[in-house]
Amino acid sequence: MLLPDSNTLRFFLWWKEGKVRGEETGRVDLDLSATVYSDNWKYVDHISYTNLRSEKMNCCHSGDITSAPQGASEFIDIDLQKVRDAGGRYVMCSIQSFTGVPYCDLPQCYVGWMSRKEPESGEIYGNRRGQARPFLRQPYFDSDGDRS
């Protein structure tokens, strides 16, 4: 995907538990992750519920939410210049269902990305700024600005 016009990329995930076709979903734990790879696709680092911060890349995860009866979100901020400085080129987003509930069996589930010109603004995300749509394939961003 073409890089946004900013130095900070935010991946986000929002979901809600509840009834689907008259059945309760029960507890739903979804996990948002980002993995960084080098020019030749060697692993550089990852950000997830198992690694909330990467000091060398100035990236951070909002924290692990393990249930969403009223709705919940997770997000990851990626400093694209620091990724490049650490030898990273490609940033790949992924989502896992820790509790095994399929995404299609949730009343609401959204995932997307947005660029952030002011990462410390306190703004979480919004449809006008983000690309809030289901990914048809696993997206990755080339920090050198190439399309993928």
Model-inferred region functions:
Residues M1-S148:
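Intrinsic-disorder/low-complexity signal
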